[in-house]
Design a protein with these regions (language model features):
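Non-catalytic alpha-helical scaffolds and adjoining flexible linkers that form interface surfaces
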Residues: 1-203
Length: 203
């Protein structure tokens, strides 16, 4: 079987059938950022995978029930869907994603900086860490943002979550990260979940 994070569309064996809705306890497994053990086969039309057998590797109750965590999960899930183009078998990336999801699930303190922390680790795993001297290369980060990035990488996860940042700072940081990723991937990145994320952290 294969164990992985839900990033792209997948349907139970047989696909959608009129009059045969998926049972609630089955569909609940397939929320954004669910981590499952599964046996998959390629669909006839390619792209869409069919799940023959699947079960949750972890139960993630707080991500499902807490609005802040579920919004962060939705943002990360959409980001991965639009930017993660690596072939299967990247164990290092998988371990990073699994660890990040479990940290989000188990966090009991402040998490307003979680998506910033995640973006640092994610871009690093993709091969273009947002640190160092870029010289004449495209750099969307301001000097103040670079100070925050460096500090966040030098402290623990718990300390990074407590790092003081204004709402506007977080929003600007995300925008800078998306421009940075667009430059390195060569693709435009438009996330529908970004507006919801900003609204959640408005207060």
């Amino acid at each position: 079987g294969r164990v992985g994070t839900i990033l792209r569309g997948a349907v139970p064996n047989g696909g959608k059938r009129r009059g045969s809705p998926i049972k609630g306890n089955s569909i609940s497994i397939l929320h954004p950022l669910s981590i499952i053990s599964a046996q998959c086969t390629s669909g006839r039309k390619g792209g869409l995978e069919i799940l023959k057998e699947y079960s949750p590797k972890y139960i993630l109750p707080s991500i499902r029930s807490e609005i802040t965590k579920s919004t962060i999960a939705l943002f990360i899930s959409e980001l991965l869907y639009r930017t993660l183009l690596l072939p299967e078998g990247d164990e290092s990336m998988y371990q990073f994603l699994e660890n990040a999801i479990l940290l989000l699930e188990r966090s009991e303190g402040p998490i307003a900086n979680f998506h910033i922390w995640f973006l640092i680790g994610y871009t690093t795993k993709l091969g273009f860490a947002p640190l160092g001297d870029f010289g004449s290369e495209f750099d969307p980060f301001s000097a103040k943002q670079r100070e925050v990035l460096k500090k966040m990488t030098d402290i623990s996860f718990i300390e990074a979550m407590k790092l003081p940042m204004e709402r506007e700072q977080r929003g600007e940081m995300i925008e800078s990260f998306l421009k940075y990723m667009e430059f390195h991937t060569g693709n435009r990145i438009r996330l529908n979940s970004l507006a919801v994320l900003k609204e959640i952290f408005k207060n």
